[in-house]
Amino acid sequence: MIIGIGTDIIEISRIERAIQRTNTFIERSFTCNEIAYFKLKGFKGNVVAGNFAAKEAISKAIGTGFRGFGLKDIEILRNELGKPIVNLSDKIYNLLEIKEFNMHVSISHSNENAIAYAVMEAI
């Protein structure tokens, strides 16, 4: 049963400006594992923006927005085929009434925008 959905779209140039403007944007927003993935991909703006949009979409699917947790409490990695894999911190699980669920995420981008869609499914 679907218990939450969320979507987010962001301009890739906005994320690129944030990366150029401050060294701390990446460190404040992403986990060490995500940063390692970005490094592997050459810190491309569309990759970073896609992960950022996914975090926003997940916060909306959860139904709280970023209340009680931060960006680094959501980790977006990839499996060997490139499918996004979501890891949530204990802080998020402690906020939720439902404890057993799957989080599905799709990330895409054009030349200008990145978009992510999240579906929270009860098990």
From Swiss-Prot:
Gene3D superfamilies in the record: 4'-phosphopantetheinyl transferase domain
Known catalytic reactions: apo-[ACP] + CoA = holo-[ACP] + adenosine 3',5'-bisphosphate + H(+)
Cofactor(s) this protein cannot do without: Mg(2+)
Protein's UniProt keywords contain Metal-binding: yes
SUPFAM superfamilies, sorted: 4'-phosphopantetheinyl transferase
Entry function: Transfers the 4'-phosphopantetheine moiety from coenzyme A to a Ser of acyl-carrier-protein.
Assigned protein family: Belongs to the P-Pant transferase superfamily. AcpS family.
Cell location: Cytoplasm
Gene from which this protein is expressed: acpS
Name of the protein: Holo-[acyl-carrier-protein] synthase
Annotated residues for binding of Mg(2+): 8, 56
Organism, as annotated: Clostridium beijerinckii (strain ATCC 51743 / NCIMB 8052)
Main location (coarse class): cytoplasm
InterPro entries xref list: 4-PPantetheinyl_Trfase_dom, 4-PPantetheinyl_Trfase_dom_sf, ACPS, Ppantetheine-prot_Trfase_dom
A molecular-function term among this protein's GO annotations: magnesium ion binding
EC supergroup of this enzyme: transferase
One Gene Ontology biological process: fatty acid biosynthetic process
